[in-house]
A protein has these predicted regions:
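Conserved Rossmann-fold NAD(P)-dependent oxidoreductase catalytic core, especially the SDR/UDP-sugar
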Residues: 79, 83-139, 147
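Rossmann-fold scaffold of SDR-type NAD(P)-dependent oxidoreductases
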Residues: 10, 71-80, 121
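N-terminal Rossmann NAD(P)H-binding glycine-rich loop of SDR-like oxidoreductase domains
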Residues: 5-27
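Hydrophobic/aromatic anchor residues within beta-strands of the central parallel beta-sheet
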Residues: 56, 96, 119, 161-164
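Strand-loop microenvironment adjacent to phosphate/nucleotide-handling motifs in alpha/beta enzyme folds
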Residues: 113, 143, 147-340
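Conserved residues in the N-terminal Rossmann fold of short-chain dehydrogenase/reductase
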Residues: 36, 57-58, 98, 194, ...
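Conserved Rossmann-fold cofactor-binding substructure of NAD(P)-dependent oxidoreductases
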Residues: 55-76
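Conserved glycine-rich Rossmann-like NAD(P)H-binding loop of the short-chain dehydrogenase/reductase
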Residues: 28-41
Length: 340
């Protein structure tokens, strides 16, 4: 499927993008294009990977010309460029709109223009019943992707545009695990926003598995969700304290801007039509048009009153969470650095 193809990763130097890049570095792709704004991160990856197949392109998804040029001759696109920190998006909503909505529209439009065969865009659990700017922008990104998937020229070209939605990615940049570990190492209290707040626990490898599954199995306009266990923030703090044999106090600081008590990966309305694929849910796009009368005779899916969220998924206790944390390279490295 990838032999002699050209792949473009937007946001290719971020936590997810660089994980995906390392996965593909030794594949039989003809070329991998990394499109991002940060020349320092690009240089670091260039030195680390030393791979002639990887082409680093400086550019911003907000600039249609630069992304359109970068997409010439591309077969597949993974769109991982985003502003993803919830509090900073709350303070700078227009910046989030420009990158996550307008920038993503540029990526999708360039993909249509360049007749790209497969596009996978990355969304988040925060896009379901969104209450914060980041979630709202990602929710609209999903709508833009589905809109492109139904375009006649995309269908004629055999193009598949789809979305993946994932929960809290453990150890990604700016997330809670690196924060707690840094607080443990410097002897500070662990700042817990709300002890009973639950979050899905996914590794970076899980998120790559999700996009690869979507890439292989998606129909146009699909949204894919990976099932994942969850834990409370307090359980996470206790598990890390035990792993690092630390006695830092836990300090409750209250929810930050735009935070929810739990996150939803699949809304009630979506669960009524979602297909359970074992480890994943597939949410098919609604391709009805605005002439609703012709659909009245069909058998409609009944709406459900149960969503799939971090409150009703499998809940990890401290022992189970410690076991999961020990599988993460970042946690292993941090533990080793302390023991040396």
């Amino acid at each position: 499927m990838f032999k002699d193809k050209v792949l473009l990763i937007t946001g290719g130097t971020g936590s997810f993008g660089s994980t995906l890049l390392r996965k593909f570095a030794n594949s039989d792709l003809k070329e991998i294009r990394v499109f991002s704004r940060d020349e320092k991160k690009q240089e670091d990856l260039r030195i680390e990977l030393k791979n002639d197949k990887i082409n680093f392109i400086i550019g911003d998804v907000r600039d249609f010309h630069s992304i359109n040029t970068a997409m010439e001759g591309v077969d597949y696109v993974f769109n991982a460029a985003a502003l993803k920190q919830v509090p900073s998006c709350e303070f700078y909503p227009m910046q989030a709109i420009q990158t996550n909505i307008l920038g993503s529209e540029n990526v999708l439009e360039a993909a249509v223009h360049n007749r790209v065969k497969r596009v996978v865009v990355l969304s988040t659990d925060k896009a379901v019943y969104p209450i914060n700017t980041m979630g709202m922008t990602k929710s609209l990104l999903e709508k833009l992707c589905i809109n492109k998937a139904r375009m006649p020229q995309v269908k004629e070209n055999g193009g598949v545009f789809c979305c993946t939605r994932y929960g809290n990615v453990m150890c990604s940049r700016g997330s809670i695990i690196p924060l707690f570990i840094s607080q443990i190492k410097s002897g500070q209290p662990l700042t817990v926003t709300e002890p009973n707040m639950t979050r899905f626990m996914m590794s970076l490898d899980d998120s790559v598995r999700l996009v690869m599954y979507a890439f292989k199995h998606a129909h146009p306009g699909d949204i894919f969700v990976q099932k994942a266990p969850a834990a409370t923030v307090e359980t996470l703090a206790i598990a890390l304290k035990e792993l690092f044999n630390a006695n830092n106090e836990i300090k409750i600081i209250g929810a930050r801007h735009g935070e929810k008590m739990y996150e939803s990966l699949c809304g009630k309305e979506e669960m009524s039509k979602a297909e359970d694929l074992g480890d994943f849910y597939r949410i098919p796009a609604d391709f009805r048009d605005l002439n609703y009368t012709k659909y009245l005779a069909t058998d409609p899916p009944r709406l459900q009153d149960k969503e799939y969220n971090s409150d009703n998924t499998r809940r990890l206790n401290v022992a189970q969470l410690k076991e999961l944390l020990l599988t993460l390279p970042y946690v292993q490295e941090e533990l080793n650095s302390i023991h040396h």
